[in-house]
Amino acid sequence: GVDYEGTRSRSACSMNYSMDEYARHVVQTFSELCAEADLPHPDLISESGRALTAHHAVLVTNIVDREDPGTRMPEALAEDAPSPLRNLWNDYWMLHQSDSGRSPVEIHHDAAQALADIQTEFAHGLVSLADRAQAEEVHNSIGLLLQKRLNPGNRVHRGLLDELNEKLARKLFVNFSMFQSLPDVWGIDQIFPILPLEGLHRPPTQRALVRDMTCDSDGRIDHYVDGDGIEATLPLPEGDDISLLAFFLTGAYQEILGDMHNLFGDTDAVDVRIDGQGEPRITHMAR
C-alpha cells in the first residue's frame, strides 16, 4: 500500500504498517509453513505495482485565477432595513469595533438564525433581493471576523472553525483537467498530497479549494491532506504570490487512465534522475 494521507491509519488511502513490517510478515508466514511441511524455502517475488510506482511522479501546474470571499466592509444599512438584517449588522459592528463579550459560537448561531430569517422572509416576498444580498454579505463578514478569534486548539471552536474554513475558503482555478491528470480523485475519491511550491517559510494561515479548468462541475478536489488528518480545504501560506501547486504520489495509474479532455493538450513531461553526486539531472523532456 501507499500512505497518501500520512496518517498511518487503516483508511483506504493510508497504511498502518511499514514496508519492512509487510515483508517480514510475508516471509515469516512462508518460512513457518515450509518448515512445518519440510519443504524447500522458495524465492518470493512480489508484484506491488502501486507501492513501487506511486512515488515516481509529481504533477506540477500553475494557478490561473483566484476567487475570494467578499472581504470589503459591508455598506451601512438603510433606515427601513428589516429587523433580522439589523440584528446581523449589530453583531458585525460589535465584532468589528472590539470584543463583544459573547462567545464566538454564540455569535455564529445568532448570525445563522438571522440569515435564515431573512431567507424565509425573502421567499415570502417580505424583503427585497437587495436586502437578502446585503444580509449574505454581512454574514460572510461576520464569519471572516470570527475566523480570527477562534482557537484551533479549543475543542469547542474546532468544529466551527472547520465549517468557516470551508465556507470562506478562496477558490483556486488551476491549469489542469482532473479527469485527464488525476482521474482517481473523481473515480474512487483518491487522496493525493498537495503542496504549494512557494511561501513554505510562512505559516499556512489561509484555506483554499482547488478547481480545475474544465467545464464540468465535478472538476474539483474535496479532500486535502493536512497536519491533523484529512480536511475539506487546502492550507496555504498567506499572500497572493503562490503560483505553483504540486500534486504528489501520482505515479500509479493516473497517466494511463487519463485521456484527452476538453481540448487540453497532453501534459508536458520531464524525466529527472539523481546522479552519483546526489544532484538532480533532467534526462528527457516531452512537450
List each language-model region with its residue ranges.
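Glycine-rich tight-turn/loop motif centered on a GG-T
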Residues: 5-20, 69
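Gly/Pro-rich turn-and-neighbor structural signature
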Residues: 6-7, 27, 39-41
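Active-site-proximal loop/short-helix segments
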Residues: 1-11, 50-58
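Charged (often Lys/Glu-rich) extended helix/loop segments that serve as interaction or gating elements
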Residues: 35, 39-287
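Alpha-helix-loop-beta-strand connector modules within alpha/beta enzyme cores
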Residues: 19-34
